[in-house]
Design a protein with these regions (language model features):
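Intrinsically disordered, low-complexity acidic/Ser/Thr/Pro-rich linker and tail segments
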Residues: 1-61
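Domain-scale macromolecular recognition modules
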Residues: 43-107, 116, 128, 172
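Blade-level signature of beta-propeller repeat domains, shared across WD40, Kelch, NHL, RCC1
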Residues: 323-347
Length: 347
């Protein structure tokens, strides 16, 4: 028999649900029209015509994560073959191959400066490498191994060359000072695994997505969220800050992508593929914010017009589920990686 729930917890859960319902009712009152209605007189966007420009072959196991450097040319990928590969996406060449101590990598991050990369996963730590210095074996030198997590490392992003922010399966967010090798802050962020982090362009704020189905907006200096967003009916697998700085996009296990707005404090866009069969693992936005792109379990990258909500087609080519996509900072290319062991650069 399952254990009986404490009556106090039951009462608190009911109170919480009532408050959430009340918030949603207030939001509905404030929403005088939908984004689609407001944009109905806008012209349709042209169909996205991009194809695989570079096919990056080098990993020999599932590739779990990809992230661009600030130069929009180099990207890093992490795979279950126990390697990080730094790619030149313009030529398709490998720049560096970094062997990892643990093959169970789930997230990678490239510093905007191009000097450092970080990774982490089932080893419950975040490892930072200096790409400009080599160890005795000739591999990129380990700068820091950031330990102390009680769950897997699911997401990491550089604030600058000396600070990194991480999200993990122990529900926490940590900010680290890389020079000191110490946490500058650590706090419980969600009621479930913190799965995804996306930074604003100025690095002052960030958005998180979680298994608890919520997304939160944070100030890097504070340990309490500025705003919490509800709406998804399953894990939020990916969040992506809107280029305008006024909102963010999400991709979820509930087979939908959504657009949230900070100013109206609620969801303003809802996007579904033509055949709603697979969840979304990752999302990205075009530089203008007009297109939202989502990598899916159905091996495709789906595209929508964010304003009018129309499905704009899909990028196909991968032969297994897409695990991660990343838009180049200049908006000129999209990188994607998959369980098919390959990385593609779309232009």
């Amino acid at each position: 028999m399952p254990p009986k729930e404490d009556p106090e917890i039951t009462a608190l859960k009911k109170e919480l649900n009532d408050l959430v319902t009340k918030i949603k009712d207030e939001q509905k009152k404030a929403a005088d029209c939908t984004l689609q209605e407001k944009c109905s007189d806008m012209g349709d966007v042209p169909k996205v015509r991009i194809s695989t420009k570079k096919f990056l072959k080098g990993h020999i196991n599932k590739v779990n994560s990809v992230h661009f450097a600030g130069d929009s040319r180099h990207c890093v990928t992490g795979s279950l073959d126990g390697k990080l590969i730094i790619w030149d996406t313009w030529t398709g060449n490998k720049v560096q191959v970094i062997p990892l101590r643990s093959a169970w990598v789930m997230s990678v991050a490239y510093a905007d400066s191009g000097n450092f990369v970080a990774c982490g996963g089932m080893d419950n730590m975040c490892t930072v490498y200096d790409l400009n210095n080599r160890d005795a074996q000739g591999n990129a030198k380990i700068v820091r191994e950031l330990m102390g997590y009680e769950g897997f490392l699911s997401s990491c992003r550089f604030l600058d060359d000396t600070h990194i922010i991480t999200g993990s399966g122990d529900l926490k967010i940590c900010v680290w000072d890389l020079q000191a090798g110490k946490k500058t802050s650590e706090f419980d962020a969600h009621a479930g695994d913190v799965v995804s982090i996306s930074m604003s362009a100025d690095k002052n704020t960030y958005v998180t997505g979680s298994v608890d189905r919520t997304c939160k907006l944070w100030d890097v200096r504070e340990s309490t969220p500025k705003q919490t967003f509800f709406g998804h009916e399953a894990d939020v697998n990916s969040v992506c800050y809107h280029p305008s700085g006024f909102g963010f996009a999400t991709g979820s296990e509930d087979k939908t992508a959504r657009l949230f707005d900070f100013r109206s404090d609620q969801q303003i866009g809802h996007y579904e593929p033509p055949n709603k069969s697979s969840g979304f693992t990752s999302c990205a936005l075009s530089l203008s914010g007009r297109y939202i792109l989502c990598g899916s379990d159905d091996n495709n990258i789906h595209i929508w017009d964010t304003m009018k909500g129309q499905h704009n087609g899909a990028l196909s080519g991968h032969e297994n589920r897409i695990t991660s996509i990343c838009m180049a900072p200049n908006g000129m290319a999209l990188a994607s990686c998959s369980w098919d062991q390959n990385v593609r650069v779309w232009v």
